[in-house]
Amino acid sequence: MKTSFDLNHAKLAADPLFGGIAHELGALSPINSRESFNRYCREACRLWNKAFPNGIGKTEQFAKLLSRIEHANDGVIRTGWGGVVITLHEHPRVEKYLIVRKNGYLALEMHEKKDERLDVHEGAGLILWRPADEQSLTVEVLRPGAEFHFQPGMEHCIIGAEDLLVFERSIDPKGMDQDLIFIYEPNAIASPVPSHAR
């Protein structure tokens, strides 16, 4: 399994709105340890918040879904970065919302057999992912309407630079959450005050 990743910021830099962030993040390549991964994700959030102190994304369903997670209802999974609301689980099909709090980020991960599609519904953030024919991780902005398809073996990571709501549809032959290969995980953080309550 590959554990050192150069980062390709060309797509991020192509948008004048994000060129400065791309330039500064370029100095943090490669990601080759848990420490460098966490430093990259934290710095991405810091630079984003400096560039966009009022944010650029809008949310409508985020607070309602986050409340479901915080009240630990059935069909939810609480995480350090926010949580998951499961809307369909008919093996091997899984559909769920990923509710990523501002400054939260998921592990850099891949799957052996799971095939997943992500649709960004609300908020804004970044995604790191490795296209099948590339060696580097591509860095792109996540905004409503963005879609991604990750075939088995494709590394990826979501960074919630702002509150972020992503819908995931997957075919998960091993069973839900049984095919998670973590390359680098977020450092443990204390649960922050929900962004909608600030």
What does each model-found stretch correspond to?
Residues K102, E112-A132:
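Glycine- and acidic-residue-biased ligand/ion/polar-headgroup-sensing regions
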Residues Y97, R117-D119, E162-P186:
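A short hydrophobic beta-strand segment most commonly corresponding to one strand
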Residues V94-K114, L142:
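Conserved short histidine dyad/triad with adjacent acidic residue
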